[in-house]
């Protein structure tokens, strides 16, 4: 998988999500390539451009987070601090867009635990992104109220 190349995803309603290249590089650095590597998690930060979303930044694992091989709990206060800083630096254009975490599988797919957690914890009138970083690929979904829809990666 190449790094520093942006990823573009599209859903059935032609909504586009662009993940900037430098963000892709950081996400790839957390892949669970070794059998002892724990899951990682953070938040997605970026811009809403009409129905389209651009992921410009992320928060990364840190103090307070609980990380195990097949479980992660994003508890660190630094995640919200990162969103607040991005919002201030961008004069209000960079916002919380959703969540990301890793899975120890090549082609990730949401677990029942993932879906339950998203339904319980992500409550918003805005659509929120749900990204899973696998060893060889990504899974991207969007939660709108109770509905989760899946994006397809556009190959470049």
Curated annotation (Swiss-Prot):
Positions occupied by motif JAMM motif: 101-114
Binding-site list for Zn(2+): 101, 103, 114
EC number per UniProt: 3.4.-.-
Domain MPN: 16-156
Keywords, in A-Z order: Antiviral defense, Hydrolase, Metal-binding, Metalloprotease, Protease, Zinc
An MF annotation (GO) of this entry: metallopeptidase activity
Any Pfam family hit: Prok-JAB
Named cofactor requirement(s): Zn(2+)
Induction / repression: Part of a CBASS operon consisting of capV-dncV-cap2-cap3.
Known regulation of activity: Cleavage of conjugated proteins is inhibited by EDTA.
Phenotype caused by lack of the gene: Not essential for CBASS function; when the operon missing this gene is introduced in E.coli it still protects against phages T2, T4, T5 and T6. Another paper shows the operon confers protection against phages P1, T2, T5 and T6 but not T4 or lambda.
One GO term of the biological process aspect: proteolysis
Listed transmembrane segments: none
Disulfide bonds: none
Positions of the catalytic residues: 39
Keyword Zinc belongs to the record: yes
SUPFAM superfamilies cross-referenced by the UniProt entry: JAB1/MPN domain
Role this protein plays: Metalloprotease priming reversal component of a CBASS system. CBASS (cyclic oligonucleotide-based antiphage signaling system) provides immunity against bacteriophages. The CD-NTase protein (DncV) synthesizes cyclic nucleotides in response to infection; these serve as specific second messenger signals. The signals activate a diverse range of effectors, leading to bacterial cell death and thus abortive phage infection. A type II-A(GA) CBASS system.
NCBIfam families: ICE_VC0181
Protein's recorded name: CD-NTase/cGAS isopeptidase
Native source organism of the sequence: Vibrio cholerae serotype O1 (strain ATCC 39315 / El Tor Inaba N16961)
